[in-house]
Amino acid sequence: MKIQNIYHLLQAALLLLLVSCTQEEFPAVQDKAQQLTISVTDGGYTSAVENMKTRVETRAVENGYTTEFTEGDACGFYMVRGGKPVYSNVKLTAEKDAATGGIMWKTDGTTLAAGMDGESYYLYYPYQADMAGKTATPAEGAVMTDAEFFKPLIDGWQPGDDQSTHAAYTASDLMTAGGSTTGTGNTIHLSFAMKHRMALAVIEMPKTVYKFIDANVPDYTVGAEATFTGTAKPLRMADGTYRYLVHSSMPTIEGCYDGGNREFTITTSASHPVVGEYKRYKVDGAQAMAVSYTHLRAHETCADL
């Protein structure tokens, strides 16, 4: 009986010792972390022509060359602490905030917490389920830029040949960013300003400008519609231009307009493509031909011209 009592006492003492070690030597690191909220914006494309003149780090973004994220867009999130991954390729999906009408980013069920020392945050778009071998491994204590962290992904990225739909175009528009944190208390806000990792070719077509004799009717401009005959299929924009994303080299873009009567070929210049920059390529000088027009008939609109 005495032996059994001594045995039970030893068990209890050992259990207390283990609990003591756990509390003192293995603190719950994650308990000190705070919940994350995330916002994502796009830094846009800059003009290759203007950058050749200035080449400054700060950049003014032209309207129309930024991406507005919409409901359903998805990014991949990474967090590294002390050189070791904490979160890897967590899917963040854009959802509409019913209260504000803005965009908020939701995880696929993972609760994100951060705020410890030695953390770095990385984001890329568009999301890919398979990211094996597409990120670099930072050395312990080292801090990588997003370009360094995602270098394998960027180097191996190939924009699609056919970018003629909005979905196909955005699927080719690789962006990455490093995160910066603000906030105190129980919630940390994490902001990402995305940088485009491809170059952008903007194709301008010749235009027809309808000038109405009636001064109350403003001029109406119509860009020629192109048919692309090669493998490269750019996306037509609302302003009549075409856009095509390229990597380190641009393929020859071939096409025709005016019912097939006029053909054109576009090849890259020596100064383009450059990552994050756009350059305009003007077919036949993108000249505007003026046509005088007396008036619109009762049943006509400018779109009928």
Predicted regions: what they are:
Residues 3, 11, 21-297:
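Sec-type signal peptide cleavage vicinity
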Residues 295, 302-305:
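Single conserved hydrophobic/aromatic residue that forms the stacking wall/gate
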